[in-house]
Amino acid sequence: MQNDTQNIIGVDVGSGSVRAGVFNLRGQLLAHATREITLFRSAGNKVEQSSREIWQAVCYCIKTAVANAGVSPSSIAGIGFDATCSLVVIGDNDAPLAVGIVLRDLP
């Protein structure tokens, strides 16, 4: 296991998948992981996603990328996060109040 330096994680949530990569501080990719997320299509051209599935995919990709990089979780100095595809509204108990609204759903 590499533990001689700090590392960073980049996460990208797209409309079809979640991706996470572990990088050293020189910007070198050490490992990455991807997980597809389901698009639900309904009448009226509505396109939605499960907020819970998105979060589960984020957690899976981060854990998998860190494990595949062979670095200690304690070596992670920061996380960059990008999500341009959806809106998630959560309630008081941190549970999603509705499905995610996807950019493709807009006219």
What kind of region is each of these model predictions?
Residues 1-99:
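N-terminal glycine/serine-rich phosphate-binding loop of ATP-dependent small-molecule kinases
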Residues 104-107:
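Glycine-rich phosphate-binding loop plus the immediately following alpha-helix
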